């Protein structure tokens, strides 16, 4: 194998490894974003449920929930 071919091969290997690392990092970022989105959605649901419960409590105590 000539020196030029060897250098081209090694450059290709390095590029392939860099691409694989970037794909792994992108997958991790996607997973983290999905987890954050799910967590935010759950927090929003909890807040909404608490607000509805508070409204119903006030309605019950004031006699408006008939």
Curated annotation (Swiss-Prot):
Sequence repeats mapped onto the chain: 31-35, 49-53
GO biological processes: response to abscisic acid; response to osmotic stress; response to water deprivation
Compositional bias (Polar residues): 1-10
Keyword Cytoplasm (UniProt): no
GO molecular function, one term: mRNA binding
UniProt tissue specificity: Expressed at high levels in embryos and mature seeds.
Listed InterPro entries: LEA1/2/D7/KIN2
Transmembrane feature ranges: none
Induction line: By cold stress, abscisic acid (ABA) and water stress.
GO cellular component: chloroplast; cytoplasm; cytosol; nucleus; plastid
UniProt region (Disordered), positions on chain: 1-20
Keyword terms, alphabetized: Repeat, Stress response
Oligomeric form and interacting partners: Interacts with DEK3.
Protein name, UniProt field: Stress-induced protein KIN2
Organism: Arabidopsis thaliana (Mouse-ear cress)
High-level lineage: Eukaryota, Viridiplantae, Streptophyta, Embryophyta, Tracheophyta
């Amino acid at each position: 194998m000539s020196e030029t071919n060897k250098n081209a091969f090694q450059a290709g290997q390095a590029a392939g490894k860099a691409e694989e690392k970037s794909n792994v990092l992108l997958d991790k970022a996607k997973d983290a974003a999905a987890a954050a989105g799910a967590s935010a959605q759950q927090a929003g649901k909890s807040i909404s449920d608490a607000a509805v419960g508070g409204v119903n409590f006030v309605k019950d105590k004031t006699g408006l929930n008939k």
